[in-house]
């Protein structure tokens, strides 16, 4: 993986391929490359390690022409083999060029087979296996490129997508979609394909989303699609509302900072049209969901990464407000063990991108079980998760470019809180909690704005952390998962090893890590757990730990040489998880900047993880 672009046109397409790659960089990358069939029907390929601008400079310095009307391009995030030019895509076998996302699980067996046919491998990738296999099948058994790709697809096992180009058939691309997303962009005398519609927004506003098992034949004037049963089929065309403007930083130096400061607006957009006169109502959940909601006795949430941390917060809420038992599953574990799903369960799938392979596998897996209903909560309107779910709740945070989740995390929590209120409303239970959520959630954007004002206080702490190798973050109640999310942000954006713990668990092993060189961040709010958290602070102080407290202004702490206190504005207890993550996001950002980390594109990470 990570990003595919392909174009068939009547005009030269080099600049559009490069633009597409630039729009895919946010998904994660370590190298990039492109191949075009030039105006003499010769296959021209170039690959480089690093950012797309490294590839652009190399193309400018090359004497050979990369002008052509058919081409493919790719940004790579390494899964098989290190980031090298040989491992970058496209991969070439004679007249065949292939770009690929996903993993071919039986590539070692196929590699051995191809070596016996005297094929030589220049890379460590599973993608080169596909290129050689298509070349071998084409030469051995003949047929159109479409027929050859169909036959080869039956030899491959895994979740993947590919786009194939043949210099002997210069006006056609063949795409296959087996669990990893591909989107066709429709143009005039030009058609395109990509793994993300952002790559094609400068070419089209009209898209076809391929379904699992689809194989598509793309020319500059026609699209033909076959489904997994090899039936020729028409797929719906969708007109997107996404604008290229979202891909701009505005007055901010980094997308990460921009997205942190966009959170009040993102939350307002998530609340829009969902606040009625005196209650919260999610129109997406009308009809069958509202009729069956009375049968729900259990909640199961499935998520990865930051979405898993937001699910952890919501567990407290589901049990406290809706009186429903709740458990949380890591998607990558959920699919590979014997699972038990109660027939009176509501299943909730959380994803920022809606393309995370583990989440999609989990969603597809549960369809064979007996349960009441499933819902997805997602930020990407036209994603695979949205299209495959029974019902979806969109968070409307706007496109998030930085790899580290910020506004999608807080809007996801907002959506979960609204869902809980909606369930209480339909079931006619806990009117007080409904009122509390209704009143609090409307002032959440304002509370986030106030929390952003602590940026200067947070910035003063940066040098105390930037040279540290380890950081411990603790919290109680809903602040425990926020401590975990804060630790994840530090890992991602500053490369500091950080761990979030439940404060009460310190004495069960973590106290052994406390020393004068390990900062301990303590998240404190004024609630019934305050006294216990204060006791934990004393435990750390007595062992010489360096303590950094983030707490509401009204809480008093005795002065101590090894304690630093950052005072936070008042926030309602219900809104503490969404509000308290903000200073942690800011701290992670400023430490990353101090350490000269590429905070928008941290090393080794991808925004959209399309492999399991």
Curated annotation (Swiss-Prot):
EC number annotated for this UniProt entry: 2.6.1.16
Transmembrane parts of this sequence: none
Gene Ontology terms: biological process: carbohydrate metabolic process; fructose 6-phosphate metabolic process; protein N-linked glycosylation; UDP-N-acetylglucosamine metabolic process
Gene Ontology CC annotations of this record: cytosol
Domain Glutamine amidotransferase type-2 residue range list: 2-221
InterPro entries: GATase_2_dom (IPR017932), GFAT (IPR005855), GFAT_N (IPR047084), GlmS/AgaS_SIS (IPR035466), GlmS/FrlB_SIS (IPR035490), Ntn_hydrolases_N (IPR029055), SIS_dom (IPR001347), SIS_dom_sf (IPR046348)
SUPFAM superfamilies: N-terminal nucleophile aminohydrolases (Ntn hydrolases) (SSF56235), SIS domain (SSF53697)
Tagged with keyword Protein biosynthesis: no
Keywords: Aminotransferase, Cytoplasm, Glutamine amidotransferase, Repeat, Transferase
Molecular functions (GO terms): carbohydrate derivative binding; glutamine-fructose-6-phosphate transaminase (isomerizing) activity
Compartments, as annotated in UniProt: Cytoplasm
Pfam families in alphabetical order: GATase_6, SIS
Residues annotated as signal peptide: none
NCBIfam families: glmS (TIGR01135), PRK00331.1 (NF001484)
Function (record text): Catalyzes the first step in hexosamine metabolism, converting fructose-6P into glucosamine-6P using glutamine as a nitrogen source.
Descriptive protein name: Glutamine--fructose-6-phosphate aminotransferase [isomerizing]
Organism: Wigglesworthia glossinidia brevipalpis
Gene: glmS
């Amino acid at each position: 993986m990570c990003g595919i672009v392909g174009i068939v046109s009547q005009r030269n397409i080099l600049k559009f391929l490069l633009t597409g790659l630039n729009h895919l960089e946010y998904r994660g990358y370590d190298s990039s490359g492109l191949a075009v069939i030039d105006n003499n029907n010769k296959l021209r390929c170039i690959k480089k390690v690093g950012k797309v601008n490294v590839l652009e400079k190399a193309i400018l310095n090359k004497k050979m022409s990369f002008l052509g009307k058919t081409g493919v391009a790719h940004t790579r995030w390494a899964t098989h083999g290190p980031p090298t030019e040989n491992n970058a895509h496209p991969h070439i076998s004679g007249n065949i060029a292939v770009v690929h996302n996903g993993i071919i699980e039986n590539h070692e067996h196929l590699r051995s087979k191809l070596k016996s046919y005297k094929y030589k491998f220049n890379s460590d990738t599973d993608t080169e296996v596909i290129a050689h296999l298509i070349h071998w099948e084409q030469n051995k058994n003949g047929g159109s490129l479409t027929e050859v790709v169909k036959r080869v697809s039956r030899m491959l096992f895994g979740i993947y997508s590919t786009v194939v180009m043949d210099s002997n058939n210069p006006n056609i691309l063949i795409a296959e979609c087996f669990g990893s997303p591909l989107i066709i962009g429709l143009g005039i005398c030009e058609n395109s394909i990509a793994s993300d519609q952002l790559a094609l927004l400068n070419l089209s506003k009209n898209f076809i989303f391929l379904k699992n098992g689809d194989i598509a034949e793309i020319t500059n004037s026609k699209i033909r699609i076959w489904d997994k049963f090899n039936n020729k089929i028409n797929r719906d065309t969708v007109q997107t509302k996404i604008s290229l403007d979202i891909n701009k930083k505005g007055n901010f130096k980094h997308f990460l900072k921009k997205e942190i400061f966009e959170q009040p607006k993102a939350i307002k957009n998530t609340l829009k049209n969902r606040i009625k006169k005196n209650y919260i109502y999610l129109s997406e959940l009308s009809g069958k969901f509202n009729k069956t909601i009375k049968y729900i006795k259990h909640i199961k949430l499935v998520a990865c990464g930051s979405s898993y941390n937001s699910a952890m917060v919501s567990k407290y809420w589901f049990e406290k407000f809706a009186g429903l038992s709740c458990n949380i599953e890591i998607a990558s574990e959920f699919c590979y063990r014997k699972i038990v799903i109660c027939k009176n369960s509501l299943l909730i799938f959380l994803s920022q991108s809606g393309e995370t392979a583990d989440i999609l596998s989990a969603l597809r897996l549960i369809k064979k079980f007996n349960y009441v209903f499933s819902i997805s909560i997602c930020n990407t309107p036209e994603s695979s998760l949205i299209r495959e779910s029974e019902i979806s709740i969109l968070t409307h945070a706007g496109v998030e470019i930085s790899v580290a989740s910020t506004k999608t995390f807080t809007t996801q929590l907002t959506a979960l809180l609204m869902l809980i209120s909606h369930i209480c409303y339909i079931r006619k239970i806990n009117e007080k909690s409904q009122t509390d959520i209704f009143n609090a959630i409307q002032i959440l954007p304002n509370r986030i704005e106030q929390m952003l004002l602590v940026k200067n206080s947070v910035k003063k702490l940066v040098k105390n952390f930037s040279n540290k190798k380890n950081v411990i973050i603790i919290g109680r109640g809903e602040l425990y998962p926020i401590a975990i999310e804060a630790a994840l942000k530090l890992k991602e954006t500053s490369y500091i090893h950080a761990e979030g713990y439940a404060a009460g668990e310190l004495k069960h092993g973590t106290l052994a890590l406390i020393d004068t060189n390990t900062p301990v961040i303590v998240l404190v709010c004024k609630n019934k757990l305050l006294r216990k958290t204060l006791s934990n602070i004393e435990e750390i102080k007595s062992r010489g730990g360096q303590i950094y407290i983030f707490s509401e202004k009204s809480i008093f702490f005795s002065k101590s040489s090894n304690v630093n206190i950052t005072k936070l504005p008042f926030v309602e207890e219900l809104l503490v998880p969404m509000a308290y993550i903000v200073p942690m996001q800011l701290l992670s950002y400023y430490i990353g900047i101090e350490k000269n980390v590429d905070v928008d594109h941290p090393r080794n990470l991808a925004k959209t993880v399309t492999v399991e």
